[in-house]
Regions:
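Actinobacteria-biased recognition of intrinsically disordered, low-complexity terminal regions
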Residues: 1-12, 158-162, 169-181
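Alpha-helical DNA-contacting segments of helix-turn-helix folds
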Residues: 50-57, 61
């Protein structure tokens, strides 16, 4: 476990400094102070390492979002606050924001991660109690929307919040009355 965390920490530092696409397994082995054999014992290949990194960081962001939104009772406000905080947390993290410097890589990582999808669906289930299938469908769409905001940001946080209020909040609840003002 310690090797895995050390490797993922080193990968994050490299992603932030060089960009995700520029980092290979030998770079990560060297930066983490482990042999390539140890690296490959922990991760079958670069795709597996990247997925593990995304999943670990997604859990960290999800835990932080749970703390930041726990006291918000209004589902609409919890949704909007959760999304705006998620965007901020990713943007403020150099290793995470590096994923979205190459738009295809970040969007692909987010959209293909079962962990990101499951955590987003769980967040949505907590808003309106929809069934898991509906929440998962909405989560797939919401992850794409978030990837869009991360790759093509609005002019400022207020503009993004306005777009979320106008377009996302009414749709994500599945019924405009669920999350409408």
């Amino acid at each position: 476990m310690a090797d895995t965390e050390r490797i993922l920490d080193a990968a994050g530092e490299l992603f932030a400094s060089r960009g995700v696409a520029a980092v290979d397994m030998s770079d990560i082995a060297r930066a983490s102070g482990c042999s390539r054999a140890t690296l490959y014992r922990c991760f079958d290949n670069r795709a597996a390492l990247r997925a593990a990194y995304v999943h670990r960081e997604a859990r960290t962001v999800a835990n932080r979002l749970a703390e930041l939104t726990a006291a918000i009772e209004d589902p609409r406000e919890r949704l909007l606050t959760g999304i705006t905080h998620a965007l901020r947390l990713v943007r403020e993290s150099p290793p995470l924001s590096a994923w979205f410097a190459d738009t295809a890589m970040g969007a692909q990582a987010a959209a293909s991660s079962d962990v990101v999808l499951a955590m987003t669906a769980s967040f949505l289930l907590g808003l309106d109690g929809a069934d898991r299938e509906a929440a998962t469908r909405r989560a797939r769409w919401l992850v794409r929307v978030l990837a869009s905001f991360l790759t093509v940001p609005g002019r400022d946080a207020d503009e993004e919040r306005s777009m979320l209020e106008e377009f996302v909040a009414p749709l994500i609840g599945g019924r405009t009355t669920t999350l409408a003002r």
